[in-house]
A protein has these predicted regions:
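Histidine-rich, glycine-flanked metal-binding segment
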Residues: 6-79
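Short, glycine/acidic-enriched loop or turn micro-motifs at the edges of active sites
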Residues: 43, 86-88, 182
Length: 190
């Protein structure tokens, strides 16, 4: 039986309460990186402290207790890199191989516009990319191709408009609409 709306709300509320309690130190975090040297990329400073994680989120830095603790004395911790605009399929490797190449260099999140694969395969290409990037150790987010083909002069294997991509908007890793490549059409009000 599917979970009720009230059940979903209650589950989300309990998760948020757990995050707040761990952040405030009222209950142990799920994981604490003890004595980690943190690189503050905004202030250009190094600080040694505990880093608390609850429900998959960093909830605090300071002095924390955790259900699981890892001694990070002498270890450096820094934020992962985010590539805000790529066309993953243009790398000419599978999503799994792409992740093997970028993760060791610190990229933990990418936002991809699957425009090229949509040009060839239409919505099947978008669906493939969503499935092929599921459960990878890099967070792969999507912006939906805004116009396939890119311009009326292009020939492609598919034609996508807002009706074709509408069903993807409910996917949790779809963030919005990608770049408008048909600038001539935009200028002319097409």
């Amino acid at each position: 039986m599917p979970e009720s709306y009230a059940g979903k709300i209650n589950r989300k509320l309990l998760k948020k309460q757990r995050i707040i309690a761990a952040a405030a130190g009222r209950e142990p975090a799920d994981l604490v990186l003890k004595n980690a040297t943190f690189v503050n990329v905004f202030s250009n400073e190094l600080s040694t402290m505990d880093i608390a994680v609850a429900e998959g989120l960093i909830v605090g830095m300071g002095s924390y207790q955790g259900r699981s603790e890892v001694d990070c004395t002498g270890k450096i911790v820094l934020p992962g890199f985010l590539d805000a605009h790529i066309h993953l399929e243009s790398s000419l490797v599978s999503p799994t191989e792409f992740v093997k190449a970028v993760l060791p260099h610190g990229t933990t999140t990418v936002v991809t516009d699957p425009h090229e694969i949509a040009n060839v395969m239409g919505t099947d290409g978008i669906e493939y990319m969503l499935q092929a990037t599921e459960d990878l150790p890099v967070d792969v987010r999507f912006m939906l191709p805004s116009c396939v083909p890119a311009t009326p002069l292009d020939e492609s294997g598919a034609i996508l408009d807002y009706r074709a991509i509408d069903s993807f908007y409910d996917h949790p890793r779809v963030q919005g609409l990608a770049e408008m490549m048909n600038f001539v059409g935009a200028i002319n009000g097409d």
